Amino acid sequence: QTPVGGTRAIVHEFVDGDPVALEAITPGLASSIGRAIAAVHALPTSVVSDVGLPQLRAIDVMRESLATLDRASETGLVPAGLLRRWELASEDQSLWQFTPTVINGGLSAGSFLSIGETVTGVLGWSRLQIADPARDLFWLLGSADAAVPESAFEAYHEARGIHDRELARRAVFAAELEVARWLLHGTTTRSTEITDDAVEMLHALLDRVHRDMTNPLTMEQDRPATLTDAHDLVDLGAPESVRLSPASASPASPSPASPGSNGSAATPPTPPTPRD
């Protein structure tokens, strides 16, 4: 690294691979993505804590979700049914019983480089932190192929060797709150186009929730979480901007570095053995 104009320039070893598009992800590539994300989450927390990066506890993640919910509620544009659904999820203690891990914090399909069905690199590390692992996985739910998130989550759990029982459900919750964040981005920037788009998506989400009462965000005791309601989000016809995480477009969220697929790309960090 070297000082450049009051900031730093960091040059990495060239990482070969093609940028990944969400609609082009196959179940095989999804499995490789799941394993790559698992490798990040298996890093020791000292990677983050030793350099003073953000560290969120499970209760902090819950409070962030509540803050987003409250801000969205204040707009008066979120259907009451969705607000109630999200409030119940926030109050469900089982949802927040997880161990925070190192996460990238800003993943989308475009974060990955691949050759064939193998991930070769991950781009953008400016949001590295300790937080909810579901945050790195929810974007996969935007795939039109149900086998994609299923393959990714299965490979992730297998690679981690730790089964986070409510991971899929928190990923669904995170995906739904992304629509709320898209709404907040529209109201904050006073963009009628974005706001109207978000409102339309919220009402479509409400319709889907009313049609399918078998997949609530809150769970009956001892019922295993599934990806069924996660994949149903695709039926909303979410625009590409939301599928690629609208929060990244919000001024309140720092933009992850997207330096391209050559010298500035970084391969996924290799965790030590044993992991964690």
Residue ranges of model-derived segments:
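ATP-binding pocket architecture of kinase catalytic cores
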Residues: 1-53
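An alpha-helical support segment within catalytic cores of ATP-dependent transferases
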Residues: 45-104, 265
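Active-site acidic catalytic loop and adjacent metal/ATP-binding pocket
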Residues: 88-135
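Helix-rich C-terminal or lid/interface subdomains of diverse kinases
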Residues: 158-248
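Intrinsically disordered, compositionally biased tail regions
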Residues: 259-276
